[in-house]
Amino acid sequence: MNQLPHPKWPERIICLTEETTEALYLMEEDHRIIGISAYTMRPERARREKTKVSAYITARTEKILELKPDLVLAFSDMQADIVADLIKEGVQVHCFNHRSISETLQMIRTLSGLIGQPEKGEKLVTELQSNLASIQQQAAKLPVRPKVYFEEWFDPIITGIGWVSELIEIAGGIDCYQEFAKQSLAKNRIVADASDVIAKQPDIYIASWCGRKFDKEKVISRDGWQEIPAIKNDDIYEVNSTDILQPGPAALTDGVAQLANIISQWAERNKKQSN
């Protein structure tokens, strides 16, 4: 009788977005990676060590096939065409579509399972959960909570996605556009009328323009925005999109830490409001 085949875990993985690359490095499974996105910034060494095969919505399909991956990891509807092309070529593809903190943690669990290392994934998840809990505990001590407006894009104006909204709340802020944060697609988070932001009266403005350099003058010169407390008091900040707009370890560590620092400093300066 023939023996049943044993599982063969992927050894030649291509990551089309940054978060799976970073997760594999943190799990010390980076030896499996043979290709990455050209937009990968974390960890920095990945840019030196791995072949770049894609942008965000485009990929070098011939190069990917040449590398002979046994698994390609993709993300979201934005990479649907890339995924379709690879599947037609017989490539094994797993496409994640996580948009919240809990889904991001589950992504790590799933990823670790795909490579036969579930305990490493659980360890990383536990560390990330512990970090978030610590930040949340500190935020609970803040004397006052600011209203935070997070801008993901400037023209049209697009507000923060789900996990960003959750991180703002964990860090001690109140997301001005919680109702938009539930929308996974950017087109459904467009603020059609910029005066709506004025009506929200945010205390803090945070920009993360998805890879574009932040232009403070462009923001403060918007019609009527001088009436916004955040603009009036120069509580205007930028968080690098690499640190917050990738739904992976970066957002749950460095990203939320930057939010917490901005919010806690504001709360300290404005603690008289709570008296």
Task: Give residue ranges: language-model regions.
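N-terminal ligand-binding lobe of clamshell/alpha-beta domains
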Residues: 1-275
